[in-house]
Structures are given as C-alpha cells and as structure tokens.
Amino acid sequence: MGFKVITAPEKVNFELDTVYCFLAGGISDCEDWQKVTINFLKDFRYEPDESDLVILNPRRPEAVFNMREQIEWEFYNISACDIFSMYFPGGEHKREICMYELGRNLALGSRFPSRFIISVEDGYKRLYDVEVQSELVLGLDIVKEHMNPTLHAVDIYNRYKWIVNYGNAGNCRRSDRGGYRRGGYR
C-alpha cells in the first residue's frame, strides 16, 4: 500500500506496523493546505518492505457535519498517532482551537518530543505564543517558521522515514505511554 489518507469521520483501525500522522491545524478562513500537503506526500517513494504511512485529515469535503462527531474523531485519533503535525496558516485568524489542541497534545506527549512537527506560515500573528508554549512543555524550540504546505510535507516524510529506520511505529499507542490507547476513535 505505502500511502493512504483517511478523512473524518471515517473510522481508523490502527495497525502496529503502520506510521500514522494527524494533520492538525487551521481549517477555517485559509487555503486547503491539507490538500497541498497530501498531494505532495503522494509523490514520495514508499518502499514495499517499509511501514505504510497513513495520513489522518480532519478536513471534510462537505461543509455541514455533526460537530460533536468531528471533535470526538479528532480528540481520539490525535492521541493515537505516531506523528502530531500542526500547521498554522498565515493571516489574521488567531486559531484559538489550534492553540488549545497544540497545548493539550504537547502536554500529553511531552515525553515524546520527536512526535511533533510544528510549522508556522509567514503572517501568522501568534508565532511567539506557539514558540513559547512548545519550549515550555518540551524544553526545546521545535517550531519551524517561514513554512508552506509543501515544506510541511517534506518534514512529515522525513519524520516518517526516521520512524521507519530508527523509531518504532505504534510507539505512542501503547497503553503505558501517558494514557494513549490503541484503537483511536471508537
């Protein structure tokens, strides 16, 4: 298989030898950066003997949906992914929900700083907040500035390759790791 995309509200059946990446970040009042990132990721080479990369995309194709279902899908699946990728698009929007998700997931996953990819596009007004929050929780600055969806895709692919070569797919879904639970969204 190599590469697959699962879009909300599709059920996710987590498999141990697969690398999962959640595309957290802005959805309202911004370009469909998830689509750009996914299209770029499709072009990378995935070896048949390597773990598959599965992208969880919270952006639905339809505009009207059950908000509770969306929040639950994101809540459970973010915690179960190997890679938490957060993208802050530029512009005036403060992205309060994204800031909450970032803080929550940094706190839950602080023992696994390599799990995080945090990218900020030029023009995002709360860059300093993102940097300080990340540094306070993880003890290091992992925020990348001057990013775009294509560069974000490169970071995701590089992290995927690192997990395949040196890490352990499924590592964050073990029940003894900060409460993460195998199985994701129910």
Model-based region annotation:
Residues 1-186:
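Conserved catalytic or regulatory cores that recognize and/or transform ribose-phosphate-containing ligands
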